[in-house]
Amino acid sequence: MAECCVPVCPRPMCIPPPYADLGKAARDIFNKGFGFGLVKLDVKTKSCSGVEFSTSGSSNTDTGKVSGTLETKYKWCEYGLTFTEKWNTDNTLGTEIAIEDQICQGLKLTFDTTFSPNTGKKSGKIKSAYKRECINLGCDVDFDFAGPAIHGSAVFGYEGWLAGYQMTFDSAKSKLTRSNFAVGYRTGDFQLHTNVNNGTEFGGSIYQKVCEDFDTSVNLAWTSGTNCTRFGIAAKYQLDPTASISAKVNNSSLIGVGYTQTLRPGVKLTLSALVDGKSFNAGGHKLGLALELEA
């Protein structure tokens, strides 16, 4: 009897994230949904011609300092081009031009410049990123009068395992000023990340999606030569499609809580508070308020 051969489909390969995004899922649980000591307003709009406008303003309740940014972005999809103009209240102007998937598939080139009229300071940076199955590479050149600095990174992935390296070479000093290494593992609902920065800082994080509405994260960090170990636990619970609550606590007894509510499509309100558990009656606690508008 002839055997029936059934074709086996190869396991789909995925593109690993850039080095800066390793462990991002765990960091987002700790960072998003909180804004201690700030009153913040974010507005995003898009014109009929496709130009995107983003405006952000914040006031620090401790110092009273007010800061803001304005960004316009236009995408020329036919040629893979993106033009971005930036301005902030420090009176710094920025221009960014990016081209993606045109020279070759997976390659992105970015030209980034900034100029401060008050001081006359100028800066320029050329960024390159290349991503394919199992690999994500990046190389940036930061131009400076003393000499350019070269930032490089590489992340390799295979069957959920991730390994990455990040470095910075200062040509003015002719030496490596940054050398970081990371190893991790991720699945659909679980991520593990460990890293060593410059051989002195050791860190790790775990992210787990316990169920559809409940995410948890654990973070641990230690610096060699000190007895200081930093440890934190955070969680986010989606109450319903329009509301979520976040909470976190660390080994310094700092307790943070946040509540996010979508008031209507395009309008989101976030309230947050930070409580010092060691001096609960002494004050020094912080509140935060953020409003996001998008149209």
Curated annotation (Swiss-Prot):
Keywords for the protein's UniProt record, in alphabetical order: Acetylation, ATP-binding, Ion transport, Isopeptide bond, Lipid transport, Lipid-binding, Membrane, Mitochondrion, Mitochondrion outer membrane, NAD, Nucleotide-binding, Phosphoprotein, Porin, Transmembrane, Transmembrane beta strand, Transport, Ubl conjugation
Positions annotated to bind NAD(+): 254-256, 272-276
Tree of life domain: Eukaryota
InterPro entries: Porin_dom_sf (IPR023614), Porin_Euk (IPR001925), Porin_Euk/Tom40 (IPR027246)
Modified residues (N6-succinyllysine): 32
One annotated Gene Ontology cellular component of this protein: mitochondrial inner membrane
Modified residues (Phosphotyrosine): 79
Domain notes: Consists mainly of a membrane-spanning beta-barrel formed by 19 beta-strands.
Transmembrane stretches, start-end: 38-45, 51-60, 66-76, 81-88, 92-100, 107-116, 122-131, 135-144, 148-157, 161-170, 177-187, 190-197, 201-210, 214-222, 229-238, 243-250, 254-263, 267-275, 285-295
Residue numbers binding ATP: 24, 32
Modifications the protein undergoes after translation, according to the UniProt entry: Ubiquitinated by PRKN during mitophagy, leading to its degradation and enhancement of mitophagy. Deubiquitinated by USP30.
Reactions that this protein is recorded to catalyse: chloride(in) = chloride(out); K(+)(in) = K(+)(out); a 1,2-diacyl-sn-glycero-3-phospho-L-serine(in) = a 1,2-diacyl-sn-glycero-3-phospho-L-serine(out); a 1,2-diacyl-sn-glycero-3-phosphocholine(in) = a 1,2-diacyl-sn-glycero-3-phosphocholine(out)
Name of this protein: Non-selective voltage-gated ion channel VDAC2
Record GO biological process: lipid transport; mitochondrial outer membrane permeabilization; monoatomic anion transport; negative regulation of intrinsic apoptotic signaling pathway; negative regulation of protein polymerization
Cross-link Glycyl lysine isopeptide (Lys-Gly) (interchain with G-Cter in ubiquitin) residue location(s): 32, 65, 121-122, 173, 278
Task of the protein: Non-selective voltage-gated ion channel that mediates the transport of anions and cations through the mitochondrion outer membrane and plasma membrane. The channel adopts an open conformation at zero mV and a closed conformation at both positive and negative potentials. There are two populations of channels; the main that functions in a lower open-state conductance with lower ion selectivity, that switch, in a voltage-dependent manner, from the open to a low-conducting 'closed' state and the other that has a normal ion selectivity in the typical high conductance, 'open' state.
Pfam families in the record: Porin_3
Phosphothreonine found at: 119
Subunit structure: Monomer, homodimer and higher order oligomers; formation of higher order structures is necessary for scramblase activity. Interacts with ARMC12 in a TBC1D21-dependent manner. Interacts with KLC3. Interacts with SPATA33. Interacts with PPP3CC in a SPATA33-dependent manner.
